Structure formats: structure tokens, C-alpha cells
Amino acid sequence: DNAKAAKIYNEMISDKNCSIFLTLAGSTSAGGCMKLYSDLVKYNMVDAIVATGASIIDMDFFEALGFKHYQGSQFQDDTELRKNYIDRIYDTYIDEEELQACDQTICDVANSLEPKAYTSREFIKELGKFLKDNAKKKGSLIETAFDNNVPIFCPAFTDSSAGFGLVMHQEQNPNKHITIDSIRELRELTEIKVKSKQSGLLMVGGGVPKNFVQDTVVCADLIGKKVDMHKYAIQITVADTSCLLYTSPSP
């Protein structure tokens, strides 16, 4: 399966008419894979990214601020972890106070922007601009994408520290604040698909990012734009084979 996936990905990269979408879900970023994703951007191996808010904010942006994830145990008592202000992603630990500092940074960036509607792509681009001057750890996916003009979309953006930070921002600015326009975001991603002669998907995990990028074909059809289905697809997952809508396709 790995050899077959590598062959398909080589075909994507060799196809000059193909736009490559990378989708990220799950905890591979906290597990140490973010440098790999940054390299895909750096070496022009992907054209757009669709990710969960957790992957982009709670893992990538969080570490760019100088914070870390720690190897722990999946068997640790959660009540004890809570007493010590430690959050857990299976066997990976996060300092809750550091996460709240990340929330506050999101709030601060939002406070600095013109109060209007932004797509997650536009807001993440502002985070990339912020990291250019303020990152404690260079080479994050957000900053690398900013440097290489690769858009990052997070359709479930508020399901992360971004959500907490933006709630704080709106609480502090009840009459004039920013909002996230998820409808325009779908339109933006669909336009990338429409303008692409061919497209390929490199999907890590499933969930919202996988569904969102696949929905671009349907969305294009509904607004009267004729597009082909995605020509290439690779999904890296531990899920069992089942209905395509909900889990992984058959090899």
C-alpha cells in the first residue's frame, strides 16, 4: 500500500496540470509530523491545505509560540491530570496554561485586525504574518505556507484555541469585531478546484477536511461550473474500509 501511495503521489507531482490538496486531521502533528507537512509546502509539493483547527492552531501555531507537546501515557488517571492542569491527547500531554496563552495570542491578533468578516484562510494568513516577527520556533506550517503563498483552510476553525480566542475577542469588542465567514471559505476553495485542470488529494486522516475538499466538486456543480472529479487520491488512515462518505475508500 505504501508503494502504491508513493506511485500515485509521484504521478500527481509529475502532472503539471494537477493542483494538489493536502488534508490534515487527527493528531499526527502533535506526534511530530508537522515538519514533514512544512517540507511539502517548502518544496512545492502541495498547492492548498485543508486542516482541522486543532492541527493548525493547537499543534502548529501553539508550538510556533515556543510551547511543546510532551510524551506521556494513555493510562494516566485523567482526574490527576486535571488537578495538575495537564491536557491529554491519548498519550501526549499539553500544559493547559500554555494553551490559554495561545488562546490569548489569537485574541490579540484578532484585536489588531479591521473588524469585518474573514475566511479562516484570511485569518490564518494574518497568523503567518504575526509569526514572521514573533515566532519562537521557526519553520511552522503556518509560517511556511505564508512564505510560499499556499492557502490554509480550516472549515472547523473554531473547534480549537482559535474558537476560544475569537470568543474572547468578541466579548471584549461586542459592537465591532471580526467574524469567520465559512460560506465564503467554501466558495474560495471551490474556485481553486474550478480553476484547476486536474486535482489530487493527499489525505491524512479523514473527518471535516476530507469531506470539505471533496465537497468542492458538488459545490461547483451547484453553481453551474463544470469540473471533473478529483483525478488522484491517497488517504493515510487507520480506519476500516466502509462507506466512502464516512471512512476510507478501498485500495
Language-model segments: residues:
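Metallocofactor- and cofactor-centric catalytic cores in central/energy metabolism, strongly enriched
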Residues: 1-66, 72-80, 84, 88, ...
